[in-house]
Amino acid sequence: MSTPERTADGRYIIVKGRRWRAQDPVLPEALTAPLLSALGTARSRLSRRHQLNDEQTAVLRQRVTWAKEGLGERGTPWWELTEDERLARARDRLERLARRDGAVREGGR
């Protein structure tokens, strides 16, 4: 997959003429890999939402939000936070995703 064009300041990527917030460049692979995996899995499941009930759809949408916040693509822009705040946010969103995974397994959903 090719690397998308970035704005001069590096804060945004350009895809099909649209500007999207870029992933936080300070995040290490140990954080980005599981966040990207969670994002991809949730999006894939949402693509089959006709097979899901409202609660399942809401849970998956929340997972997308948490993953994108962790990556710095949503929420407070990463360039407005300190590096420590950016890393803490990514770790927090990973923890939220992991807790939700445990609740889903325990609840049988």
Placement of each model-derived feature along the sequence:
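Extended, charge-rich alpha-helical interface modules
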Residues: 2-109
